[in-house]
């Protein structure tokens, strides 16, 4: 199986449906894209990633604590 966003073969099943075999969720270990087996994942060309884009991605800042 290949990632629909970056084309990597490094994809793993993250979780199974809690009810029967309704669906599975897969995640790409390279770009963190995830999708359900029941979805038809379509990634628009401008959102696809390559090695250069992944290497230059910014770091996502942590979520600050809630104010009391």
Curated annotation (Swiss-Prot):
GO terms, biological process: catabolic process; response to toxic substance
NCBIfam families according to UniProt: VdcD
Protein name: Protein ShdD
Miscellaneous: It is not known, if phenolic acid decarboxylase forms a complex composed of ShdB, ShdC and ShdD. The term subunit is often used in reference to the operon, however there is no experimental evidence to prove the existence of the complex.
InterPro entries: VdcD-like (IPR047707)
Keyword Hydrolase: no
Bilayer-spanning residue ranges: none
Function: Involved in the non-oxidative decarboxylation and detoxification of phenolic derivatives under anaerobic conditions, however the precise biochemical function of ShdD in metabolism of phenolic acid is unknown.
Induction: By 4-hydroxybenzoate and 3,4-dihydroxybenzoate.
Species whose genome carries this gene: Sedimentibacter hydroxybenzoicus
Keywords, ordered alphabetically: Aromatic hydrocarbons catabolism, Detoxification
Keyword Signal: no
